[in-house]
Amino acid sequence: MSTWTGKRVAVLYGGRSSEREVSLRTGAACAEALRQKGHDVVLVDVDLEVAARLRAERVEVAFVALHGRWGEDGSIQGLLESMAIPYTGSGVLASAMGMDKTVSKAIFRSLGLAVADYRVFPRAAAGAIGVDDLPFGLPCVVKPAGEGSSVGVHLVNAAAELGPACRDAAGYAGDVIVERYVKGTEVDVAVLEGKALGAIEIVPANAFYDYAAKYTAGTTKYFYPARIPEAHVRAVMEAAEAAHRGIGCSGVTRVDFIVAADGTPYILEVNTLPGMTATSLVPKIAAGLGLSFPDLCDRILDGAALKA
């Protein structure tokens, strides 16, 4: 029996970030899964009145399914701490550090993890970024520092593409990060309660695993377990656990990598609130271990707590 059986569970979803649509799908799926496990669930679309809604619904525990700003940056976690409502996932500080790629990349390097060369530019300077500003040259990847789900991310192969890519990334949250493109196999690792569950290989139909490839069914192939040497699998799972611990994460995370031909796992980011939709990777990995989606959600809920 779950710790929270018989308690009023709020699944927090939606919000107003660029990842709202993904969050709506994640929240709906998780709410249904928790109901299948017998929980008393209310869905709460997060807005400026969320605190009043939580009080009115007499919520006793929160299942956070809120992607992007407000949900993954520590904001909703801070509110829940102040209301003394236990919640799933990482706390305020870990969420904020995981969401800010500039901060998390520095932490990864301090842990001795492999990080592709990169440069950080203020949003105001994005329109003036040129190839001469990049010691690693092209190809490169441009991304906003404070977004997830590959929102605003571009693979740049030619100098003429760099300016438009940087200007687009500057329209989102945070500074603009430009990093060296690493050729290799895209591998994501699910970590639950500090333990790596498994590594899944991602093969998008196009050259780049962008937002459409992540959330459009049939556009990407997944292979579990990942089709890389066993030694490389062990290395990437160990790196994922180190990143999870280093950021100070709780509950479930998804850690994204590019594994180079020599087996070096270049870490891209830690997702403190990974997607939980029909096409999401954490449920795929869990299913490969025989853990059903309702059971996975129940495990995540069971770890709900105040972190401060």
Swiss-Prot record:
Location within or outside the cell: Cytoplasm
Domain of life: Bacteria
Catalyzed reaction equations: 2 D-alanine + ATP = D-alanyl-D-alanine + ADP + phosphate + H(+)
Enzyme type, top EC level: ligase
Cofactor dependence: Mg(2+); Mn(2+)
Keywords recorded for this protein, A-Z: ATP-binding, Cell shape, Cell wall biogenesis/degradation, Cytoplasm, Ligase, Magnesium, Manganese, Metal-binding, Nucleotide-binding, Peptidoglycan synthesis
Entry's Gene Ontology molecular function annotations: ATP binding; D-alanine-D-alanine ligase activity; metal ion binding
Positions contributing to ATP binding: 133-188
Annotated residues for binding of Mg(2+) 1: 256, 269
Pfam families: Dala_Dala_lig_C, Dala_Dala_lig_N
Pathway the protein acts in: Cell wall biogenesis; peptidoglycan biosynthesis
Every ATP-grasp domain range: 105-302
GO cellular component, one term: cytoplasm
Protein family per UniProt: Belongs to the D-alanine--D-alanine ligase family.
Function: Cell wall formation.
Protein name, UniProt field: D-alanine--D-alanine ligase
Organism name: Anaeromyxobacter dehalogenans (strain 2CP-C)
Gene name tied to this protein: ddl
